[in-house]
Amino acid sequence: MRNESERRAAARRRAEHRGRDAERRVAGWYAAQGFVVLAQRLRTAAGELDLVVADRTTLVFVEVKARNALRSAIESVAPRQRRRLVAAAAIVLAGQPDWGRAETRFDVVLLVGDDVHAIRDAFRADDP
C-alpha cells in the first residue's frame, strides 16, 4: 500500500514540475510577443488560471497543456473545464477591473516537446 501511495505522490510531483515548467515557457513565449504577464497560477473559487497576460488592447486567459502528442493536448480541454475557466475569469475581472481591455479571449497553448502550438481565441465565454 505504501509503495503505491509513494508512486502516486511521485507521479503528482513530476506532473506538477512539468506543468510549472510548461507555464514558464509559455509565459516567456507571450512576453516575446509583447504581452505582459499579469498572473501565473492564479487560484479562484472556480478554479485555477494558468496564465493571465495582456497587451494594450487584449486580455488573455491562457490554459497551458503539456503533452507528448498534439492530439492528446487538444482533447484535454473538455467543455466542463472551459466552463470552469470562464467562471474563474469572471471572478478575476470582478476583482481586478483595471485588467479589463477592449478584447478578452481564451487561448489554449499546447506544448508538445519544444513546440508551442497556440490556439488563439480557442473558445468564448458564451460557448455552450
UniProtKB/Swiss-Prot annotation:
GO molecular function, one term: nucleic acid binding
Gene3D superfamilies per UniProt: 3.40.1350.10
Pfam families: UPF0102
NCBIfam families: YraN family protein
PANTHER family xref list: UPF0102 PROTEIN YRAN
HAMAP family, per the entry: UPF0102
Family listed: Belongs to the UPF0102 family.
Protein name listed in UniProt: UPF0102 protein Acry_2261
Species the sequence originates in: Acidiphilium cryptum (strain JF-5)
Lineage of producing organism: Bacteria, Pseudomonadati, Pseudomonadota, Alphaproteobacteria, Acetobacterales
